[in-house]
Structures are given as C-alpha cells and as structure tokens.
Amino acid sequence: MESRSILETIQMVAEENLDIRTITMGISLFDCVDSDGERARQKIYDKITTSAKDLVKVAAQIQEEYGIPIINKRIAVTPIALIAAASQDQDYVAYAVTMERAAQALGVDLIGGFSALVQKGYQSGDRKLIASIPAALAATSRVCSSVNVGSTRAGINLDAVGEMGRIIKQIAADDPVNCMSLVVFANAVDDNPFMAGAFHGVGEADRVINVGISGPGVVKRALEEVRGQSIDIVSEQIKKTAFKVTRMGQFVGSIASERLHVPFGIVDLSLAPTPNEGDSVAEILEEIGLESVGAPGTTAALALLNDAVKKGGVMACEHVGGLSGAFIPVSEDAEMIRAVSAGRLNIEKLEAMTAVCSVGLDMIAVPGDTSAATISGMIADEAAIGMINNKTTAVRVIPATGKGVGDAVEFGGLFGQAPVMPVNTNQPTTFIKRGGHIPAPIHSFKN
C-alpha cells in the first residue's frame, strides 16, 4: 500500500469520523426448530452463543492492531416467526428474551431477527410474532424487530400495514423509545448488517459475516476540495472517496472472516451518519450546493450522492449487499436535527428523498396523538415507493406520547434525539380499513 494512502486513511479515522459502523454475524436458526418451545429456545441460545463466541474479541483485536474503530458488534438471526411456528407457543416473547440473554452473554450491542415476512400473507407464526412485538421490546434492550409488509414481486399486504400502525401505537404507549427497535419494510434484504432491520435471510449460508461502513465526514471533507466545480467533478470525487472508505470495510471484513472461520458475506456501502458534528449526510448535501437540506434540489443532490457512493464502492469489495446507499435517519444526523427544528425539512420532503436513497422515513418522532391509521398510511406510502421503484423502503417512526410539535425525544448515544415533526392530520382510516392486498405492479413480471 502506498504511503500516501496509509496517511489518508489515518487522517480519515482521526479527523473525519471514519469507522466501521458494524460487524454483524448472520446465524441460521433452522436447525433449532422444535415442536417443544422450551427446547427450541435452548437450541437457539446454544447456537448463537457458540457461533459468535469470539465475535467481540476478534473485533477488539482488529481495532487494536489496525487502529480502525469498530463501533458495533451485532448478530442477525433467521426470522423468529419461521422458527417458532413449529412450536405450540401462543406468545413469542420468550424467544426475544432468549435472544437478549444470548446477546448479553456475548457482549454484542444488538441482535436482530425478531421478524416476520408477511408481504403476501400470514403464516401460522407471523400473527403470533407481530402480536408479541410490544411485550418483546418492553422486556429487552438489545433485541431488534422488523416486519416486511410488501415487495415489488408480491405487492403490499394492507392488512399487515394496518396492524403495524396499531402495534407501533401500542409500543409507544408503554415507552416511545422502544419504537426505535422496530422497522416496517418493503423489499427487505436478507443480508442487512444495520439495525434495527437486520435478519438472516432464508437463502443465506449457515453463518456469515457482513460489514457496514460509515463515512459521511470523509465525503464532506473531500467535497470541500472541489467547491465551485461542475457537478460531474462532484460525482467523481464522491466515487473516489467511496472507494477508499469501502476498501477499509472489505479489509476488516476479510480479516474478521478469516479469524472467526466464518464466510465473508457482503459490505454494505451505506453512508450512516451519527449525531456527532462533521458526521452528517445532510451536510454533504449542503456542501453539494444547498442552502439547507430540505430546499428544492435536495432530492436531486441525494440521488447524485447515492448513485456515486454505489459506483465508487462496488469496485472496492468482492460482494456488495445490504442496503447500500445514504441513510437519512433524522435523530442520528446533527444537521437534519437542526433543519427539522428550524422548519426547513418536513416529512413530505423526507418522503420524496426516500425514493432515491437507502431505506425510508427513519427515526422520525411524530406527535403522541398521531392516530394508528395515520402511521399505517405513512407505512403504506413508503411501501408503495419501494414496490414501484424496486428498492428497499421502510418506516421507523416514534409516536412521542404526551409530546407535541416543538418537543423532542432523547435516545442518547448513536441514536441522538428526534424533534417532534408535524403530521398531516387528514385521516386515511377508510383506506386502511379496507384491508386486503395491493397487487404487484405490472413491471414486476420479469419472467
């Protein structure tokens, strides 16, 4: 490696907030299926704790040896609705508690996979799992849950969309902060290393290592060098920077895979912000030329950023996967927090932005009196964007119980704080109550 490249990487880590956001081990639980729920849960605990026993230790070794910060160590498992369905259990909270115990024993930050895939309808375990989500999140602190309600090939399960609005309200009634551990997806991916939406897909290997990178600060600093130049140069600069950032993810993932004796899966190319100053996706958009994120042109600037990150990153690693784009979680981005608080960025503009970037309406706080139907409508809109555009979209929304516009919900750490945003108060109740299934779009028929 050239000396200049080494020095560049050191500078990125020391001054520009470059890090590996997560090393996530995916673990299949299909060999844990049992008609006896208690036996199944013991198998799950044993499989997770055996498979990932060295994950935290190896991550610490890599960080120490190479000076590359590795922020999170995480686990994703097969959707529990598929595993628990064979048992006679009527309530799946105990499975979440088992996941929590395993995560605590290993010292990992989060564990995902308390999930159900209902894009085309419910199977026997799906309804039980969804009904268990509020109690499961209340009983745990490291467990993450997700439900996939639509896809380009299957359409949108409007019954599930309606149910998830009610579930989110139920969670918020107990503790709004628990809502940050639940994501409602369309076109969920099997190899996502990021939480709260990670689960281990049914077509994945028995165990796999996936890596998520982070580097908004690096991209912003690089763009400062091309101020006043054409947008072509901006795109090229982002591509070059994304290559360097992703190369580090490939390097760390390869070493972790080798030391853990687990196959290396993918690098997720997503730019993931944090509440730290200088680590913001919104600031990149402003560096491209917007007076503020939320201004006309925001969606175009984000589309440019997202595409350039993919083009640069895809050359730097063996396999790209996950969500791979730019995240726009309001509470986790310092400049977005300021823009929302000042009224420069609203939910409608964020929804437009989700058509061209990773995921969707993420870490958004809404007034506590927002109806379940309104939340379901937000989910339906995002699922429609994902379904029609053949991309992953999602909603992670926090109804701030007892709070209104102008207040804030404090999460702490990497999750930051979310200003409560105004929501259109016209109700979609009759639409959501219709239920049924929104058919897949005509362009989904590829065969």
Curated annotation (Swiss-Prot):
Family: Belongs to the UPF0210 family.
Descriptive protein name: UPF0210 protein lp_2507
Species lineage: Bacteria, Bacillati, Bacillota, Bacilli, Lactobacillales
Subunit structure of this chain's protein: Homodimer.
Organism: Lactiplantibacillus plantarum (strain ATCC BAA-793 / NCIMB 8826 / WCFS1)
SUPFAM superfamilies linked: PFL-like glycyl radical enzymes
Pfam families: DUF711
InterPro entries: UPF0210
